[in-house]
Amino acid sequence: MKRFLTRTLPCLTGLSTVLIVLGMMMWRYLDEPTVLPLLTSSHEDLAGEIALVNAAFARAQTTPPLSSVPAADALTLARRLSLSLTGAPPSLEEIRRLEALPAGADPVNAWLDHLFADRRYADYLAERFARAFVGVETGPFLVYRRRRLVTWLGDQIAINRPYDELVRQLISAEGLWTSHPEANFITVSVVAGGGGPDETKLAARTARAFLGVSLDCMQCHDDKFSDRWKQKDFHQLAAFFAQADTTITGVREKRTKDYEARYLGEKSGTKIAPQVPFLPELFAAGGSRREQLARWITHPENTAFARVTVNRTWAILFGRPLSEPVDDIPLEGPYPTGLEELAHGFIASGYDMERLIRVIAGSDPFRRESRSVDPDKPVTAEQESTWAAFPVTPLRPEQVAGSVIQASTLQALDGSTHIIQKLRRYGETRDFVKRYGDRGEDEFAEESGTIPQRLLLMNGKLVNERTKPNPVMNSSTRLAHYAPSDAKTLDAAFLALLSRYPTNPEREHFTRLLEGKEKKARERAMADLYWSLINSTEFSWNR
């Protein structure tokens, strides 16, 4: 077949040539050829740390027995990782590479090797963390500055820069927001219409994002529910940002500037000196106020910094944090199972983000199925709450869009994708999320699907454009033309859409839909199949 296509290609022009090329490309994935396997590397040094984490969860999982929830297969694990770390499921091209792994290779670490080398991972993780750092506020200047910051974050994540270094540079950044994008952590808080950065906004974000402490309400009064936090804790933290000033040369330190605030019950404001809200023995003088704060936050003995980072990373991988809310963790505990083991391992690794992801993905909770093997004994709420089964959670809006877009293209839409395809994907994702509804900063709050969301998947522009008969742009039509058999067609469609093979009942049902149909009728049948699977519950959930 390949030899025939190669000899015929020079004789054709125009659309015929394009279709032949697409057929040649698809044949690689439909006929299950020998595909270059993923690079595999040994990560035996992780075994001890993963064992500590697994032991902690085993102690907490007393009932029901763990044997009722088996280990997930390689395709399920790859789908979880791709959705969590790139915002889209694996392509059929990538799945064939996964299936070509040598026997005995660990699919999780092999897949992570693949994802960490893909710029999609860095860009997507940067966007997820940017929500905690600077929120999702809009406006022409804010959007551009935020985008510059996200790009910078992606550059740091791509080289696996130690997370503590990254955060120190964010908090203490100086310079123009164009040439020093990290300074946009400060500039996005600049009050509209002039003025310097908003110290209170920076204090609130810093406390939540880097300490896992909710001090927002303490801006106006002491904590009404405990004696732990006082109004002074908030304003003394805000005072660290008072000397950050914005000028024509960008963010600079204005050492003579003081911070003033009015405490509850007082008639006038007062000057407030900076002071950390806990663990003052870790604080060291020297440098600007923001440099001092950054060193204290990332001090190895300030475990709060590691805890909130671990909690957010866990939530990105599972769709649900260990401790809820994700950015409000009690300083003195008690802590949820696994959090302390992961936090101390993160610190010991030198705040290695890729290693943290490998440890979490290598743990028993991540590698388990989300369903019981016994249909008469389904997974219980207790099993999910103790992580004895993988929690089933709805996909985020951009993950739903990414799934539709990737499923319609059998090749991976990765960092090497042509700029035209990238721009199309960006525009389609932006429009879909706008209509589907962005979760905003509170991205891990439990939400149920809405009727408008279901209607958007049923009748929306993205699904229609990506499933309708189109031999150049859509995989549904290309499968209808080039797959050598109905069985191969169904295998490819299910792998592209759901990252699994069809069950026997599914195969029987959809074979009847396809058998005997040719050309236009087969194109329409494949479009219907794609539409049906996109509108299935399984498509829009992480399992």
Q: Can you annotate each of these PLM segments?
A:
Residues 279-282, 291-294, 454, 473:
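Hydrophobic helix-coil surface modules that form long, contiguous segments used
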Residues 283-287, 292-305, 309, 313-317:
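Structured secondary-structure scaffolds
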Residues 1-18:
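N-terminal Sec-pathway targeting helices
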Residues 271-285:
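Internal "kinase-insert"/substrate-recognition segments embedded within catalytic cores
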Residues 499:
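Conserved micro-motifs of the catalytic ATP-binding
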Residues 346-349:
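Localized edge beta-strand/strand-to-loop motifs within extracellular or lumenal beta-rich domains
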Residues 16, 23-270, 274, 305-343, ...:
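Short, structured secondary-structure elements
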